[in-house]
């Protein structure tokens, strides 16, 4: 059983016809699986801005080149995960792919990295969402922690109750988000063509640090959070209507194009228009205010951004309990993680995620900027392991055009592996060490639980076999 086979729908015991009825179209699938990926511009743009603004106009002039390099990485990942969609019709998450092709320990490392990723996605998304709305209503800034915890409590309760008709619930905010940002970007391009670019030298603050290679690497590493969430569709291939692999693959490409457009568009306009954020404002808020003014449209954009980031956080409440249940089925976690409550959800996993995310929000004072260094480490470790597993898969299966497919995943694995090293090095002191320490500790925990459960099985078998 894979990460996506269990828990795709509210209750795994529902009849086959019900499963078929709940399969999603490409438009529904885009809404269901893309929120955290599309909403990642909320924190990726901000981290690139914060990383470069300390070097003044010279630093900010590198925003678009850095975003372009990250978009190239996004393209490699999109093509790689497109292949995973085609090769694993039952769902191909990092844990599944790595364990099946690289072995148990690499699979557990991927699982540990995913757990860290899911946890940080909740904390970062909710705190970034609060930043978005506080940019519109500055009086809310002192209440970042409280508001983040309030949002966390809300989505926890909704998930414990079981959100059965998630398609429509997800689709409305996702498409509102696209309807808010894509026209705004289009208007920005038109305005740029009429008024021309604005020199950053006239708007950027004075540099307080020199522009160094280390600063650029550090900014690149935090900006790479823009590619988080791209794996979600490969996890959910069975949820798509037949032909599921084709529909999932096409949805992956559409999502990646939207991610690239939003990311490059917002970063590009910010740089070319010379947009600079105030001390209590996100860079996306500053861009929206610059383009549409401080009126109803601006406030609507900020509200939609908050909602989108909250839904992005909710994807972890679907993915992590499912992953924990699969690992418990594989005997690497306690059996209670497989239990569904009366509403057909993995309540133990949901509660565990909510508690851990709450601790992080409180421990880091509701600061998404402080949480980001922990985030990217697990993401790129999981990406590297899954793509390395795909190279092994194609080398073993040797199907049609297997050499080209293996080469693509190899290039992707090398790219994400290098990015993992850059993130670990440049953000180690900033908090990446916590994730780098937590991942092996989780692997040791999984192995310990597996050993204990095997011992218990042996003891139970011996007691039942004795006369």
Give residue spans per PLM region.
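TM-loop-TM module centered on a large, flexible mid-protein loop between adjacent transmembrane helices
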Residues: 103, 254-312, 337-365
């Amino acid at each position: 059983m894979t990460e996506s086979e269990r828990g795709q729908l509210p209750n795994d015991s529902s009849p086959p016809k019900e499963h078929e009825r709940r399969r999603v179209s490409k438009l529904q699938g885009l809404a269901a699986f893309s929120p955290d990926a599309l909403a990642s511009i909320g924190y990726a743009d901000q981290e690139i801005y914060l990383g470069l603004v300390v070097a003044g106009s010279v630093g900010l002039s590198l925003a678009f080149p850095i975003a372009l390099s990250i978009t190239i990485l996004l393209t490699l990942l999109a093509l790689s995960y497109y292949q995973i969609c085609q090769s694993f019709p039952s769902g191909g998450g990092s844990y599944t792919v790595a364990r099946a092709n690289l072995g148990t320990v690499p699979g557990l490392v991927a699982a540990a990295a995913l757990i860290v990723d899911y946890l940080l996605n909740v904390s970062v998304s909710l705190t970034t969402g609060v930043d978005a709305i506080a940019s519109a209503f500055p009086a809310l800034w002192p209440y970042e922690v409280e508001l983040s915890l309030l949002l966390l409590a809300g989505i926890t309760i909704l998930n414990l109750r079981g959100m059965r008709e998630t398609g429509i619930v997800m689709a409305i905010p996702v498409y509102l988000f696209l309807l808010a940002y894509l026209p705004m970007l289009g208007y920005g391009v038109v305005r740029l063509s009429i008024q021309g670019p604005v020199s950053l030298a006239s708007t950027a603050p004075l540099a307080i640090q020199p522009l160094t290679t280390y600063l650029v690497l550090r900014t690149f590493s935090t900006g790479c959070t823009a590619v988080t969430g791209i794996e979600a569709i490969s996890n959910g291939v069975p949820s798509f209507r037949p032909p599921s692999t084709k529909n999932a693959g096409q949805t992956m490409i559409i999502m990646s194009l939207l991610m690239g457009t939003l990311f490059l568009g917002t970063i590009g306009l910010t740089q070319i228009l010379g947009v600079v954020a105030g001390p209590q404002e996100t860079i996306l808020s500053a861009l929206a205010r610059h383009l549409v003014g401080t009126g109803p449209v601006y406030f609507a954009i900020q509200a939609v951004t908050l909602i989108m980031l909250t839904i992005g956080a909710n994807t972890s409440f679907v993915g992590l309990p499912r992953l924990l249940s699969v690992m418990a089925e594989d005997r690497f976690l306690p059996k209670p993680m497989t239990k569904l409550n009366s509403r057909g959800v993995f309540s133990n996993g949901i509660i565990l995620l909510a508690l851990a995310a709450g601790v992080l929000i409180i421990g880091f004072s509701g600061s998404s900027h402080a949480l980001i260094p922990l985030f990217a480490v697990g993401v790129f470790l999981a990406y590297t392991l899954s793509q390395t597993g795909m190279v092994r898969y194609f080398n073993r299966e040797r199907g049609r055009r297997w050499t080209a497919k293996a080469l693509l995943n190899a290039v992707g694995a090398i790219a994400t592996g290098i990015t993992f090293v850059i993130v670990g090095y440049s953000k180690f002191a900033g908090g990446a060490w916590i994730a780098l320490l937590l991942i092996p500790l989780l692997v040791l925990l999984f192995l310990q639980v597996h050993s204990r459960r095997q011992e218990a099985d042996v003891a139970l078998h011996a007691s039942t076999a004795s006369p």
